[in-house]
Amino acid sequence: MEIRVYNSELDFLGIIENQTSLIWTRKYFEPGDCELHIPITEENLRLTRRGNLLWMKGKKEAAIIEDRKLEESDSRNEITVKGRFLSSYMDRRLIKSTVYFSGKVEEAMRQLLQGVTLIPRVELGELQGFADKVEFQATYKNLLVYEEKLGRSANLGFRFRPDFNEKKIYFEVYRGTDRTMSQGVNNRVIFSESYNNLNDTIYRENAQLYKNVAYVGGEGEGSARVYVQVGEATGLELREVFVDAKDIQSENMTSAQYKAALETRGRETLEGAAVSASFECDTGADENFRYQINYDLGDVVTVKKRAWGITEDLRITEIQEIYEYGGRKIVPTFGTAIPEKIDWSDT
């Protein structure tokens, strides 16, 4: 396996072939990341400068070098490189104008990217035509944070796909394929002990941060302030949260449009505070269902763990490709990973 290195202008710089470890983590709702370990050599020092790009042939993603550590001791002479995938360029941009949008989520994601300060070499990819709709207003928000929110709201993934021949980077929105047992259109994919592809399993579920009713406060003061409620529950099942949405202004909107924008903010908050449940496993040398042939990132598959009484249809939200000791290990995560905390500052 060779790792090709490019500069930020997408010019080819060289090849890394002497790595001891590479962890390439693809993520559906956010930029993926990587961690690379290589020996310290003059050539590797040249290639691993901050801002350079790492890419492997056939990949739809490339990683930006953001962190580099040099370590020398009696037992170690190593460079450790870490970075996020190209879509993290959006973390460098703000939505500075007031954007009011009512329409399809995919088109909103594309419009937000077009409305910020230009990211060099980035262009819109082909429009897929996903029908999911949204209504929202955003001002002075981080572009990447909002793209992630929109993607999660409609179960859409996104990426920056590099084309090193054209020296362009394409923003693509995509949706995984339904491969569950309950459907009959696509080839089914099942992860279970009987298929020997559910090894070293970890299952997590957590409701500590769960909220199911949001009270959203819009513009105005005191009794004149506009409020909307999103969600319903009673008794011990009721878990309430307040969302301050004064940044959403009613200018140039009807009353119905304004309340719809507040409701969208409330739904975003509840989506970020859902019950978390996830499977993580080592697929082993699975010959029944092969990665990127029978299934890929974003697909919805059936996961069965009979000993634990669990059978669920879950989306593959993350896939770790681990390259070590001359081999490759695939570790998918199914479902929603458990957040350490919820950041309410941008809701």
Language-model features: where?
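Surface-exposed cap/loop segments at beta↔alpha junctions
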Residues: 41-128
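Extended Gly/Ser/Thr-rich low-complexity repeat segments
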Residues: 45-58, 91-100, 182-193, 294-299, ...
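Amphipathic, non-transmembrane alpha-helical segments in extracytoplasmic/periplasmic proteins
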Residues: 27, 34-36, 83, 97-123, ...
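Oligomerization/assembly interface segments of phage tail-like spikes and tubes
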Residues: 26-40, 77-88, 216, 272-286, ...
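Acidic, low-complexity/disordered segments
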Residues: 74, 81, 219-257, 284-347
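Solvent-exposed edge beta-strands and adjacent loop segments
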Residues: 1-29, 192, 197-204
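Short beta-strand-centered interaction patches in the first periplasmic/extracellular domains
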Residues: 60, 69-90, 126-211
